[in-house]
Design a protein with these regions (language model features):
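Intrinsically disordered, low-complexity, charged terminal extensions of DNA damage-control enzymes
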Residues: 2-5, 16, 20-53, 59, ...
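Cationic, low-complexity basic patches in intrinsically disordered or flexible, solvent-exposed regions
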Residues: 7-9
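Catalytic cores of DNA base-excision repair glycosylases
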Residues: 35-37, 42-233, 237-246, 250, ...
């Protein structure tokens, strides 16, 4: 849902809010309750007028839908998630359908969304629900938090948004709103900073209307209190926000300490026979776990050795344009090496190999760089 015009948003009632103290215990519990009620009242008033209420997972809401959306939304924006969510719901209308599906198909539908461990955990969690809970999504915090890929905030979001249970949340959007409003210094990835933010989230979460409030906090962070260029003049918390008062929003939340990412090189072998290209499935865990990728080598010598062992002629081996793919912990410089072959019988003994048909793609999960190179091959970019 788009944010409405600035002139409209400024009509939201604003209250003066004295910041809660993150470092010292409040001297008066009544003061904290009053401040928290002011905070939640402002946020709820804003949400009733401007919050998002028609996202696909908000229609005919169920714990399964909310869980699926929350996992997809980790590290990913709403606009990107929507088409993936809709495809998943068509193919897997129930958690039992997801549990019984092959992992390859789940990874295939996830291709392009990134952070593939989420998809593997999603599949494991669905199987766990089918086995331990008879296909009914659990409804207690401990049971939900025990699912693979679900932490405290995600569990709280699932139960509060779908069932109205009283649990605070602390996703990236909520961290940003709280850190700015109460000037919580430091990177939220540090335990002591996260602890302060959790304490604030617990204090401001109202006893009633938690479903609307938690959604409102996520919307406020996504639509108004954005990472860059926040719309402070449109924020219902503007008069009580320390960062707004001090024009210091850029300082909050604190940034992750910079680190120099190591660089690696990977040679990808794009071996093509007519409309088919050789792919190999990665091991279940580790980098691109369970996805199909081109045979990969640390250097060109390793690639030539692999071809020689299989008596494959490398005379027509051609290097394509190299490019960089960045992971959270290193850069991978990918060097694609294209090789047309007249026969693929020498590679059929590869147990995890697949000849991928470019014209009729099989339903398997692909790493993003692999999908990019396959698309180039489809349009004849190797020539």
């Amino acid at each position: 849902m788009q944010v409405k015009e600035e002139s409209q948003l400024r009509k939201v009632p604003v209250y003066t809010l004295r910041p809660l103290c993150c470092n010292l215990a409040p001297s008066n519990n009544e003061t904290v309750i009053m401040q928290a009620s002011q905070f939640s009242a402002q946020v709820l008033s804003w949400y009733d007028k401007y919050g998002r209420k028609t996202l696909p997972w908000q229609i005919d809401k169920t714990p399964y839908k909310v869980w699926l959306s929350e996992v997809m939304l980790q590290q990913t924006q709403v606009a990107t998630v929507i088409p993936y969510f809709e495809r998943f719901m068509v193919r897997f209308p129930t958690i039992t359908d997801l549990a019984h599906a092959p992992l390859d198909e789940v990874l295939h539908l996830w291709t392009g969304l990134g952070y593939y461990a989420r998809a593997r955990n999603l599949h494991k969690a669905a199987q766990q629900v089918a086995t331990l809970h008879g296909g009914t999504f659990p409804q207690t915090f401990d049971e939900v938090a025990a699912l693979p890929g679900v932490g405290r905030s995600t569990a709280g979001a699932i139960l509060s948004l779908s069932l109205g249970q009283h649990f605070p949340i602390l996703d990236g959007n909520v961290k940003r709103v709280l850190a700015r409003c109460y000037a919580v210094s430091g990177w939220p990835g540090k335990k002591e900073v996260e602890k302060k933010l959790w304490a604030l989230s617990e204090q401001v979460t109202p006893a009633h209307g938690v479903e609307r409030f938690n959604q409102a906090m996520m919307d406020l962070g996504a639509l108004v209190c954005t990472r860059s260029k926040p719309k402070c003049a449109l924020c219902p918390l503007q008069n009580g926000c320390v960062a707004t008062a001090n024009a210091s929003w850029a300082q909050y939340p604190g940034k992750k300490p910079k680190q120099t990412l190591p660089e690696r090189t990977g040679y990808f072998l794009l071996m093509q026979h007519n409309d088919e290209v050789l792919l190999a499935q990665r091991p279940p865990s580790g980098l691109w776990g369970g996805l199909y990728c081109f045979p990969q080598f640390e250097d060109e010598d390793g690639l030539h050795q692999w071809l020689a062992q299989r008596q494959i002629n490398a005379d027509n081996l051609t290097q394509l344009t190299a490019f960089r793919h960045t992971f959270s912990h290193f850069h991978l410089d990918i060097v694609p090496m294209w090789l047309p072959v007249s026969s693929f019988t020498t590679c059929m003994d590869e147990g995890n190999a697949l000849w991928y048909n470019l014209a009729q793609p099989p339903s398997v999960g692909l790493a993003a760089p692999v999908e990019r190179l396959l698309q180039q091959l489809r349009v004849g970019a190797q020539v």
